[in-house]
């Protein structure tokens, strides 16, 4: 049995901590045989391969009595780059407990658990459901809408350095004034409405006019402005920080993708440039 969870790109500008899409990079966990102790085969560097791994910790949090197994983990989701690497592990851990513990969890229950562990639903929701998900957490209640995502292309630049979410949150203000909050939420409302109605030019303007986090975090990602300028010059709808960064996502018309890819490539930045697709399935067994 194999558990597969997609990478995710959260926020999409002003949808701070509440909106995200699933994209075509994946964490996969093969459930192998029972063993005396938990052991995870992987070639992912310094990640623990015993029960201190977040995957197993999450599973045991839900089902502490499940038998130890040997697992195999593979992933092309880069760590601490803004593509939901920790969320994918949390969601996989929940499903691991669900399968081995025969918990029969509903998708809604998985989301509630994942949000409680992660602290916000913007990554875990699309990791579970795929597509574009807009979610709200009030206390213990998590409401969400799975929405159709427009037909467009995604080009992502992944810098070769990590940016921890905690460090990226440290640059955010502790509070906004009432006037700032109204302005920021109006931009978010417009971005969502424009995405859902297919008005991609207005969606792009709203995404790039975020007032919640990007105006504070941009300085942490030196590649952001050069990529944004190159993408805009070649017809992109929007460029935004994926999650807390440092990954940078460009939304563009399908016919502009290659020109934008080549323009970013010519900047000579150090990192990985990839073309991504929307993942429509989310968490699944394969």
Swiss-Prot record:
InterPro entries: GHMP_kinase_C_dom, GHMP_kinase_C_sf, GHMP_kinase_N_dom, GHMP_knse_ATP-bd_CS, Homoserine_kinase, Ribosomal_Su5_D2-typ_SF, Ribsml_uS5_D2-typ_fold_subgr. It is found in: Cytoplasm. GO terms for cellular component: cytoplasm. It comes from the Bacteria. It is an enzyme of class 2 (transferase). One of its GO terms (biological process) is threonine biosynthetic process. It catalyses: L-homoserine + ATP = O-phospho-L-homoserine + ADP + H(+). Belongs to the GHMP kinase family. Homoserine kinase subfamily. This is Homoserine kinase. The gene is thrB.
